[in-house]
Amino acid sequence: MFRKTFIRSLAVLTLLAQAPVFAADVTLLNVSYDPTRELYQDFDSAFARHWKAKTGDNVTVKQSHGGSGKQARAVIDGLSADVVTLALAYDIDAISERGLVAPGWEKRLAYRSAPYTSTIVFLVRKGNPKQIRDWGDLVKPGVSVITPNPKTSGGARWNHLAAYGYALRQPGASPQTARDYLAKLYKNVPVLDSGARGATTTFVERGIGDVLLAWENEALLALRELGPDKFEIVAPSISILAEPPVAVVDKNVDKKGTRKVAQAYLEYLYSVEGQEIIAKNYYRPAVDRYARKYATQFPNIKLFPISELGGWTQAQKAHFADGGVFDQIYQPGK
C-alpha cells in the first residue's frame, strides 16, 4: 500500500514538474512630463525584454504625458500611476504631501533619484535671422519668444528660472532688476502652451516665434527629426542644471501589488542599457561613466543648480505660487 501511494506521489510530482510555468502579466503606468515620450518608448521595450528574461513575466508599461505640474495634479486627483517621472522635484513633493509617495523619496535612488539631467537651450530658425546669442537678446524689441506656461509646465519653470539666474548674474543686478528682465521677456511671448511639446509644435509646425526656449533633449530631437537645414541650436552663456526625478507611487503600487516591478523599472534606468537609451534620446546620463562617455554630444554650457535659487520649495513659492513673481509680471496681450 505504501509503495503504491509513493509511486502515485512520484507520478504527480513528475507531472507538476513537467507542467508549464505560466508567466504573470504585469501592467505599469508611468506618468511623465511632456517631452519624454520617445525616451520611455525605447526604455519600456528594453525593460520589458529585461524583465521577461530575468523572471519570465510579461510587463506592459503604459505612458501618460503632459505638463509636469498638470501631471502631478492628475496623480493627486486619482490617476493611478505606479511610477512618476516628472520634470522637477517640487511636483513629486506635492504628490508626497498628499500621502501617495513616502517622505524621503529622493533618497531611494542614486543622484537624488534623477537618473538623467538636462538644461535649457534656444532653438532658432536656420540662419538665426534675429541673431539671438544669449539671454539678453530675448528681450530685444521685435523678438518673439516661445515658452510654455510655468503654471502647468515643468520645462517652463526651468526656462523661467534659467532666465532669472542669468539676470541675477549681470553687473549691478538685484532681485528687482532680474524681475524687470523677466517682465520684458514675457512681453515678447505671444502664446503660452500648457506643456513643452505643445510649445515645440507651436514653434516648429505652426511657424510662430523667432526662438523656442527648449529642453536640450527636445531641441536636439527637433534638429535630428527635422534637419539642420531648418533649425539651429544656440547654447546660451549660462543655463540651469535641470534634474528630472523619478519615484514609485507607494500608495498605488501597494494597492495594486506592483511594487517589485515598479521599483525594478526605475532602477533599470541606472543600468548600462538604461543609461545608453537615455543618451540616445539626448538626455544627459547621471551615472558618471556614461556622463563622460557622452559629454561631447552636448553643448558645453556653464550650469548652475536650483540650490543657488534656494531650492525648489522656495523657488516655487516665490515665482509660481498664486501671487508670485510670474503672476505679478505676466500681462497677456500687453
Set out the residue ranges of the language-model regions.
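Sec/Tat signal peptide C-region and signal peptidase I cleavage site
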Residues: 19-23
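N-terminal segment of the mature folded domain
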Residues: 24-153, 295, 330-331
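Periplasmic-binding protein-like
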Residues: 114-119, 179-186, 192-194, 226-259, ...
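Short helix-loop capping/hinge motifs at secondary-structure junctions, enriched
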Residues: 127-133, 152, 165-173, 252-260
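Ligand-binding pocket segment of bilobal, Venus flytrap-like solute-binding proteins
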Residues: 170-237
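Extracellular/periplasmic juxtamembrane helices and adjacent flexible linkers that interface
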Residues: 253-334
